[in-house]
A protein has these predicted regions:
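Terminal amphipathic alpha-helical/low-complexity segments used for targeting or macromolecular assembly
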Residues: 1-76, 205-206, 210-212, 216-257
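Structural signal for interior beta-strand "rungs" in well-ordered beta-sheet cores
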Residues: 72, 77-222, 226, 238
Length: 257
């Protein structure tokens, strides 16, 4: 893909308006628009290093991908204190960012969602409506390979503090992830409700089911010196499924207590 600076600027404007996005849900299935990732990578190649310093704070980055500027008309709340949104990221009206937080290029954050302090929404991550990303949670970026599915958090999900969701993991609607839950494509997630491990789907990614309530857990090593020493390895555990009657944070608090 070959672009000039004006074409790339127009492309970023389309991303920022929500007219185009890296992944979209079609007939219940998520589809990657690989050409958008290709264009983002082209933008990095186009750019030259430039001084973006502000006052006493030194910043140097590619001139094609500066910090995105917002106006009151965008209806996005970015509370003062060190947050940053990169060019080419979409934040819908009514999104709230608490400082400091960061949203990278290609990310899509839908209406009513909150990004709390010290949280990251990585490149191309797709965040649904009314999602709560709690303090220090990390939603990983997936820019390469271009055909790889980004991390996707569907509507109404609660991501607890210090969670880490990486490598194209899909979290379905209404799920609740307790503080400290870490999931990537090779993480063994145990479903204690159904008595089995969640297996990667046909694309190789882990899918957390809709309404699942997930907490950090462990499982024992079964053989070798680790077993003899009583060592356990980290394993997220689905402890129940939400029934839709209880607020996510209250339900999680009750389970943990």
């Amino acid at each position: 893909m070959i672009m000039d600076n004006k074409q790339f600027a127009d492309f970023c404007a389309d991303l920022e308006s929500g007219r185009i996005r890296v992944a979209e849900k079609i007939d219940g299935n998520w589809k990657v628009n690989a050409w958008i990732k290709e264009a983002i990578l082209e933008g990095f190649k186009l750019g030259t290093l430039t001084d973006m310093s502000e006052g006493q704070f030194p910043f140097i980055d590619k001139d094609t991908i500066p910090v995105r500027k917002f106006t009151v008309e965008d209806k996005v709340r970015i509370v003062p204190g060190g947050s940053s949104v990169r060019r080419g990221a979409y934040l819908a009206p009514s999104v709230i960012m608490m400082p400091p937080a960061y949203v990278n290029i290609g990310a899509y954050v839908d209406e009513g969602s909150m990004i709390d302090s010290h949280a990251l929404v990585g490149s191309c991550a797709q965040i649904g409506k009314n999602v709560h990303i709690a303090a220090a949670a990390q939603i990983g970026g997936v820019l390469e390979p271009v055909g790889a599915m980004p991390v996707i958090i569907e509507d109404g999900v609660f991501i607890g503090g210090n969670c880490g969701i990486y490598e194209g993991v899909l979290v379905r609607e209404g799920a609740v992830l307790g503080s400290g839950v870490i999931i990537n494509k090779s993480t063994a997630v145990y479903d204690a409700v159904h008595g089995d491990y969640i297996r990667p789907d046909e694309t190789g990614r882990i899918v957390i089911p809709a309404g699942a309530v997930v907490v950090a857990g462990s499982r024992p090593i079964r053989k070798g010196p680790g077993a003899e020493a009583g060592i356990h390895v980290y394993t997220p555990v689905i402890v129940k499924y939400r029934d839709g009657k209880t607020d996510a944070s209250v339900e999680l608090e009750d389970l943990l207590r």
